[in-house]
Amino acid sequence: AVHGDPDIWYNFRQIEAMVSNFPQYNWFDAMTAYPQGKNIDWGPLFPLIASALCIMTGAVQRVDCIAVSSWVPVLFGILMVPVVFFLGRLIAGWKAGIIAAIFIAVVSGEYFYRTMAGVVDHHCAEIFFTTVFCLFYIYTIRKASEHEVRLKSPSSLKPILVPSVIAGVAFAAAMAVMPTTLLFAMIVALYTLIQYTWNAFHGKSTDYLLVVNGVVSVFAIASLAIVGVHSPVYSLATYSAAPTHAIALLFFGTALLQIFSMLSREKPWVFVGMTVAGAIGCIAVAALVSPTLVNSGFSALSSFFGQRFQDFPIEEQKPWSLLQIW
């Protein structure tokens, strides 16, 4: 049975329109926010995958499109099992990988709902692509810890280039599903700051982070360029120029930390001082040059760590709880 969630039926509408005009995506819907209409803030990749599957199976009528695309969340759920196994094995060994794979196959709550047959929503694709991104990003970091990476030695970059590219492609795919997956860029930015600081106090090189963050940034910006700018609102949660600017800041921020680490070699507190001064300076410059970007950033943080009254009806934006997990 198909769920009654209006988002699911809206996805069916987008998929049906895409099947008829493949691969054209319906970026503006006159019937949403009637009578003005509305620019669609959801990405095109999930409907593209579903509509391509419909066309390949010969499902072009409405009922057939619904029947075929209803299985797309299940397919993503199946693909998550090996991804979670490898992620668990990478972090804590093969036994942890098996346990994680078993749990991801039987866990209930929000995850089960998002990967259930008939719940045709983009969240299953968000989960899959961001998990693949985490898998290869962590794998790249693990490889860098086993083989010293130096920017002055191009041959030392070989072990991390391929996993960095795969991580970049996965993140690019996630951004093409939904711009709010930009959240993972914020996680990467926080990790990068912590890792650079840790390595500064322990006398270790952090060249590999410049490489992997650079590759991820290039692929993410390329993905956003292919998708294009379709929102008149400058916001990190829409397909405006804001997500592209934020991804560029991730790379330039990493490059700035790399410069600070090179200038303050064996002087960790100098690195900390330069980082704090640099952060204050960057925020001040951004506030002067593009106050809209700064406001959008603070709004995104407020939405993530708090909850605005207008977001209350949105299930996926509610604070997580043990009840939702299980």
Model regions and ranges:
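Active-site lumenal/periplasmic loops and adjacent helix-entry segments of GT-C-fold
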Residues: 1-91, 95-103, 107-131, 149
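Transmembrane catalytic cores of multi-pass membrane glycosyltransferases
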Residues: 126, 163-166, 170-326
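Membrane-embedded helix bundles of polyisoprenyl
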Residues: 72-90, 95-197, 212-230
